[in-house]
Swiss-Prot record:
Pfam families: PMEI. GO terms for molecular function: enzyme inhibitor activity. Residues 1-22 form the signal peptide. This is 21 kDa protein. SUPFAM superfamilies: Plant invertase/pectin methylesterase inhibitor (SSF101148). The keyword Transport does not apply. Keywords: Signal.
C-alpha cells in the first residue's frame, strides 16, 4: 500500500502538533513537581497525563490523587496476597494484618479526597474552603496511615524479604501520596481569600 506525499505530510504535522501541545503541559507538570518532596517521582507519575492536566492546577492535584489512589489499590492487593501466604511467623502475620488495615484506611481517605475534588468545580467561598480542608486533612491522614504501616515491622527479628517487599510497596505509595498532598496544598493556597 502506497501512501501519498500529502498523507505523509499531514501525518507528520499531526505528530508535531501533538508534541508541541504536550510540551507546555509537561513543563507545567515539571515546574509544579518542584514543590513536592519527590519531584522525580512526581514528574514520572504525572507526565503520562499531560494531555488531561494541561496547565490546570486543579486537574494536576486531582490527577495526583488518582495516581495515589491507584498505587494504594495496588499495595492493598499486594498486602492481601501476602496476608494469605503460608509459612509466616505469627509476628509477621500480625504486622502484615495491621499494615493491611492501615493501607485500607489510606485507600478510603484518598478515595474520599478524589470524590471531594470532583465536587470542587461547583463550590465557591466557604463551601470551597470546607471541601479543600477535607481533602487536605484526608490526604494528610492517608500519608500517616501509610507510614504507620511499617511500625509493626520494627526490630531485627522482622528483617528479611517480607519486610523489604512491604517496605517497597509502602514507600512507593507514600511518595506519590506525599506529592499529591503537596500539589493539593499548593492548589488550596492559591485559592484562599
Amino acid at each position: 500500500m502506497k501512501l501519498s506525499k500529502s498523507t505523509l505530510v499531514f501525518s507528520a504535522l499531526l505528530v508535531i502538533l501533538a508534541a508541541a501541545s504536550a510540551a507546555p503541559a509537561n513543563q507545567f507538570i515539571k515546574t509544579s513537581c518542584t514543590l513536592t518532596t519527590y519531584p522525580a517521582v512526581c514528574e514520572q507519575s504525572l507526565s503520562a497525563y499531560a494531555k488531561t492536566i494541561q496547565n490546570n492546577p486543579q486537574e494536576l492535584a486531582s490527577t495526583a490523587l488518582q495516581v495515589s489512589l491507584t498505587r494504594t489499590q495496588q499495595a492493598q492487593t499486594f498486602m492481601k496476597r501476602l496476608n494469605k501466604f503460608k509459612g509466616l511467623k505469627a509476628r509477621q502475620y500480625a504486622a502484615i494484618h495491621d499494615c493491611l488495615e492501615e493501607v485500607e484506611d489510606s485507600l478510603d481517605r484518598v478515595s474520599r479526597s478524589c470524590d471531594e475534588m470532583k465536587n470542587l468545580s461547583h463550590a465557591k467561598g466557604n463551601d470551597f474552603t470546607f471541601r479543600m480542608s477535607n481533602v487536605e486533612t484526608w490526604v494528610s491522614a492517608a500519608l500517616t496511615d501509610e507510614t504507620t504501616c511499617m511500625d509493626g515491622f520494627a526490630g531485627k527479628g522482622m528483617d528479611g524479604k517480607i519486610k523489604e517487599s512491604v517496605r517497597a510497596q509502602v514507600v512507593a505509595v507514600a511518595r506519590v501520596t506525599s506529592n499529591a498532598l503537596a500539589l493539593v496544598n499548593n492548589f488550596a493556597a492559591k485559592h484562599k481569600h
